[in-house]
């Protein structure tokens, strides 16, 4: 069965593993998922990630991050632009999550960027997800 929205599946697996306090989660690999994982790592939402060859294709293994008393680093994840309803934002109208405390992941002509990086570069694009 083909997957309609692999990014939503990726975010759902992260959300579920985070809710269950798992230390790591395995998802099917794709370049866009690896780029999203890199943004989450740079922003401090996950500890690390790596790619492994599985029996069928590659897998992306993400190590989740928790505080000293097991409080979650990721409070929420939300898919914004979906296959049935694409959401775009211009560089002057980039959305903010929790007044700038969260991160907006945007697909631009310069690759995947956070809202702050896109504003600094003056580019807009497709709003993929909110993370807080």
Swiss-Prot record:
One Pfam match:
Ribosomal_S8
Q: Which UniProt keywords apply?
A: Ribonucleoprotein, Ribosomal protein, RNA-binding, rRNA-binding
Q: Which GO terms describe its biological process?
A: translation
* GO CC annotation terms, alphabetical: ribonucleoprotein complex; ribosome
Q: Which GO terms describe its molecular function?
A: rRNA binding; structural constituent of ribosome
The protein's matches in HAMAP family, at most eight in alphabetical order, are given as:
Ribosomal_uS8_B (MF_01302_B)
**What does the UniProt function comment say about this protein?**
One of the primary rRNA binding proteins, it binds directly to 16S rRNA central domain where it helps coordinate assembly of the platform of the 30S subunit.
Family the UniProt entry places it in:
Belongs to the universal ribosomal protein uS8 family.
Quaternary assembly: Part of the 30S ribosomal subunit. Contacts proteins S5 and S12.
Designated name of the protein: Small ribosomal subunit protein uS8
Q: Write down the species.
A: Mycobacterium leprae (strain TN)
């Amino acid at each position: 069965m083909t997957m309609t929205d692999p990014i939503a599946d990726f975010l759902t697996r992260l959300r579920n593993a985070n809710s269950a306090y798992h230390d790591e989660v395995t998802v099917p690999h794709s370049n866009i998922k690896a780029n999203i994982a890199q943004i989450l790592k740079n922003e401090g939402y996950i500890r690390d990630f790596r790619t492994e060859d599985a029996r069928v294709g590659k897998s992306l293994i993400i190590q989740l991050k928790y505080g000293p008393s097991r409080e979650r680093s990721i409070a929420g994840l939300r898919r914004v632009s979906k296959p049935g309803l694409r959401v775009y934002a211009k560089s002057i109208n980039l959305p903010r999550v929790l007044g700038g405390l969260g991160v907006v992941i945007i697909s631009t002509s310069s690759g995947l960027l956070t809202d702050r990086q896109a504003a600094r570069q003056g580019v807009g694009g497709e709003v993929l997800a909110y993370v807080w």
